[in-house]
Swiss-Prot record:
The keyword Aminoacyl-tRNA synthetase does not apply. Residues 47-75 form a propeptide. This is Bombyxin A-2 homolog. Heterodimer of a B chain and an A chain linked by two disulfide bonds. Pfam families: Insulin. It is found in: Secreted. Belongs to the insulin family. Coiled coil: none annotated. Disulfide bonds join 26-85, 38-98, 84-89. It comes from Samia cynthia. Keywords: Cleavage on pair of basic residues, Disulfide bond, Hormone, Secreted, Signal.
Amino acid sequence: MRTQVLFLIVVLAVMASGDDTAHVYCGRRLATMLLYVCDNQYQVKRPPYISSENEGYGWKWLERQRARQLDEARGKRQGIVEECCNKPCTENELLGYCYK
């Protein structure tokens, strides 16, 4: 019951705002917004992976995880928390996480 009330409040707040301003969404609020924006179907957006386990690292004797840790050129993986909790994001950015 409490979750339903929270969900309803968030939905009404989003509908009332009507604009696409950026907001910070964290924790349960982020999950609730994803469910609302994505119509209950969302997925985790992941960067493409290298197909071969050690391809591209040049350190074939190291395990994949250790080689990835040593690879300084590799950028930080961005996810929904980085995009919407650590900094404000818009509904359009949230839509990028919806299942297509």
